[in-house]
UniProtKB/Swiss-Prot annotation:
Its main location: mitochondrion. The gene is Hadhb. Mitochondrial trifunctional enzyme catalyzes the last three of the four reactions of the mitochondrial beta-oxidation pathway. The mitochondrial beta-oxidation pathway is the major energy-producing process in tissues and is performed through four consecutive reactions breaking down fatty acids into acetyl-CoA. Among the enzymes involved in this pathway, the trifunctional enzyme exhibits specificity for long-chain fatty acids. It comes from Mus musculus. NCBIfam families: AcCoA-C-Actrans. The modification N6-acetyllysine is found at residues 73, 189, 294, 299, 333, 349, 362. It catalyses: an acyl-CoA + acetyl-CoA = a 3-oxoacyl-CoA + CoA; butanoyl-CoA + acetyl-CoA = 3-oxohexanoyl-CoA + CoA; hexanoyl-CoA + acetyl-CoA = 3-oxooctanoyl-CoA + CoA; octanoyl-CoA + acetyl-CoA = 3-oxodecanoyl-CoA + CoA. Disulfide bonds: none annotated. This is Trifunctional enzyme subunit beta, mitochondrial. The record marks 429 as: Increases nucleophilicity of active site Cys. Keywords: Acetylation, Acyltransferase, Endoplasmic reticulum, Fatty acid metabolism, Lipid metabolism, Membrane, Mitochondrion, Mitochondrion inner membrane, Mitochondrion outer membrane, Transferase, Transit peptide. Its EC number is 2.3.1.155, 2.3.1.16.
Length: 475
């Protein structure tokens, strides 16, 4: 499928390590568009703002992220969310009645527990006086939960909020067909035998065909994998580059797992099964093995495969967010400040997965920072091709000028600072829970390495995106 982007993106910059070495021309910086100002450097010791509350992450946890169809397959989403909440309670010893509000993100709703935040909170033993609500924003659902918590605290409505997310891909709701649903509802309303027999006479075998959850984008009728394949082609990202990046993610995740850096994980005793203590999707392979896989979406010439895509994952995360004053009054040592954040949206057809490209310069400007000020980058890895396409877009003056209305590029993140403990490709991606994992990875990396600022960014279905600045809490 050829679009205007396919013909124009091939003109992007090649300064990224991952760019192709041929058939790409240099970019011009002479656009006459009315552009947004370039990011300006501001030297700051902290991003604290006068007369505004400092909002901190006290702690964040997640249960192990598992391949769907494995140890969590017989559970319900609220079981996973409850386990994450229980793990947070155990690690922080926060009195349950101190929590003012609970917010969880999720994408595919379990119909029996439409407000999974409330059901999980009750199951974890929180006070029945503590309100809870569930939010959905595709892959940035728990990001939305976190920033909603920030808003509640900043406005003075709350001092202590728990935010998190959950997804159970092992048991997604599968509905009867619409014709079957209509017949069943009508049968329930029928008052006489004659009415029931009349309705049953209209039954057809194809009524029994199930209605699966939508995989394609509603607005474009295109799957995200298909969009990733087109995006990779438009930005001239090769199959080899995608496989190399995926191997990097898995190798770094394995190293982080072995060295104990994934400290946000809390063990989960699965009822009737063993205790789960670590992610099970990390699978360092070889480029030779990865090259044997066939394209998963655009066949036979696509470049997106099972190996360079994130996998269906079950998991949950939870985070304790407080005003700094309240945290210190209760004797906690926070892990990080949650600073500026931004949400963006763009064309879901051709730019579905470019959320980080659009969000990054905006959040940097909001915070008065540049890419050079950032010590740790944590981006959601939906697909290798998505990450590498974002790198190229971020490193392109041409793209900045022609698609973003900016004078200059923001620049691509240096790999030595980027997702160095693995990412969604290797650790897994429970849609509703990934945002909290990203923020905790950023906070923990800053603490370990002595950095000051981290930048978290993610794309999401619908052509949306998010970015946030995380600032280390002084040791």
């Amino acid at each position: 499928m050829t679009t205007i982007l396919t013909s124009t993106f091939r003109n992007l910059s090649t300064t990224s390590k991952w760019a192709l070495r041929s058939s790409i021309r240099p970019l011009s910086c002479s656009s006459q568009l009315h552009s947004a100002p370039a990011v300006q450097t501001k030297s700051k010791k902290t991003l604290a703002k006068p007369n505004m509350k400092n909002i901190v992450v006290v702690e964040g946890v997640r249960i192990p992220f598992l391949l769907s169809g494995t140890s969590y397959k017989d559970l319900m989403p609220h079981d996973l969310a409850r386990a994450a909440l229980s793990g947070l309670l155990h690690r922080t010893n926060i009195p349950k009645d101190v929590v003012d509000y609970i917010i969880f993100g999720t994408v595919i709703q379990e119909v029996k527990t439409s407000n999974v935040a409330r059901e999980a909170a009750l199951g974890a033993g929180f006070s029945d006086k503590t309100p809870a609500h569930t939010v959905t924003m595709a892959c940035i659902s728990s990001n939305q939960a976190m920033t909603t918590a920030v808003g509640l605290i900043a406005s003075g409505q709350c001092d202590v909020v728990v935010a998190g997310g959950v997804e159970l891909m092992s048991d997604v709701p599968i509905r009867h067909s619409r014709n079957m649903r209509k017949m069943m509802l009508d049968l329930n309303k029928a008052k006489t035998l004659g009415q029931r027999l009349s309705l049953l006479s209209k039954f057809r075998l194809n009524f029994l065909s199930p209605e699966l959850p939508a995989v394609a984008e509603f607005s474009t009728n295109e799957t995200m994998g298909h969009s990733a394949d087109r995006l990779a082609a438009a930005f001239a990202v090769s199959r080899m580059e995608q496989d190399e990046y995926a191997l990097r993610s898995h190798s770094l995740a394995k190293k982080a797992q072995d060295e104990g850096h994934l400290s946000d994980i809390v063990p989960f005793k699965v009822p009737g099964k063993d205790t789960v203590t670590k992610d099970n999707g990390i699978r360092p392979s070889s480029l030779e093995q990865m090259a044997k896989l066939k394209p998963a979406f655009i066949k036979p010439y696509g470049t997106v495969t099972a190996a360079n895509s994130s996998f269906l994952t079950d998991g949950a995360s939870a985070m304790l967010i407080m005003s700094e004053d309240r945290a210190l009054a209760m004797g906690y040592k926070p892990k990080a400040y949650l600073r500026d954040f931004i949400y963006v949206s763009q064309d879901p057809k051709d730019q579905l997965l470019l959320g980080p490209t659009y969000a990054t310069p905006k959040v940097l400007e909001k915070a008065g920072l540049t890419m050079n000020d950032i010590d740790a980058f944590e981006f959601h890895e939906a697909f290798s091709g998505q990450i590498l396409a974002n790198f190229k877009a971020m490193d392109s003056d041409w793209f900045a000028q022609n698609y973003m209305g900016r004078k200059t590029k923001v620049g691509s993140p240096p790999l030595e600072k980027f997702n160095i403990w693995g990412g969604s490709l290797s650790l897994g991606h429970p849609f509703g829970a990934t945002g909290c994992r990203l923020v905790m990875a950023a906070a923990n990396r800053l603490r370990k390495d002595g950095g000051q600022y981290a930048l978290v960014a993610a794309c999401a279905a619908g052509g949306q995106g998010h970015a946030m600045i995380v600032e280390a809490y002084p040791k």
